[in-house]
UniProtKB/Swiss-Prot annotation:
Entry-linked InterPro entries: DapH (IPR019873), DapH_N (IPR013710), Hexapep (IPR001451), Hexapep_transf_CS (IPR018357), Trans_hexapeptide_repeat (IPR050179), Trimer_LpxA-like_sf (IPR011004)
Protein name stated in the entry: 2,3,4,5-tetrahydropyridine-2,6-dicarboxylate N-acetyltransferase
Native source species: Bacillus cereus (strain AH187)
Catalytic activity, reaction form: (S)-2,3,4,5-tetrahydrodipicolinate + acetyl-CoA + H2O = L-2-acetamido-6-oxoheptanedioate + CoA
A GO term for molecular function: tetrahydrodipicolinate N-acetyltransferase activity
Amino acid sequence: MKMMDANEIISFIQKSEKKTPVKVYIKGNLKEVTFPETVQAFVNKKSGVLFGEWSEIKTILDENSKYIVDYVVENDRRNSAIPMLDLKGIKARIEPGAIIRDHVEIGDNAVIMMNATINIGAVIGEGSMIDMNAVLGGRATVGKNCHVGAGAVLAGVIEPPSAKPVIVEDDVVIGANVVVLEGVTVGKGAVVAAGAVVTEDVPPYTVVAGTPARVIKEIDEKTKAKTEIKQELRQLNPEK
């Protein structure tokens, strides 16, 4: 998987068309109203639903106010630079409420749980789970077969563009409510205890805990048993 360069992300945001998409429920004498091709109009003579840019739909509503009895607007963003990721072709389990921006890489059989937030440029490896309410900032990278616990934060780095992003290597377990600061690498097979604040690189196959996090021991069989990654949670339906 390719990590986006910070300057690529900055350029994408700068050049993107800022959008305020809306969904509008409308009723009235709609046979008298003409809708442009740039607005998706699913209407009959008396009612319907519109999808499009707010500035354009507002103009339609204002210019046809004598024909429109009532309308309700649904709107969840304003001048948004980054669309949501199109999830339909992704071979992963993504639960309702996850917020995933465009230009995020998600490996096969990954799991993204409810209300996780994943920003532009983040990378999630095959078979990794991002648990409820976890946050992956811009360009944060998670390797294969990892678990990022509920409420954990992997700090994002888009500006300054020279800053190094968070990198979590393969087979890492990060506990609930952990904070990993910018520039930190968590080494392969490491375990970060719940609530830790990680300010420095974590050596491979070690357990760290505390604020700031410190190595408390090397991985042993007991730790492996307590932090086992269950592949059964990552299985998808067979393709048809």
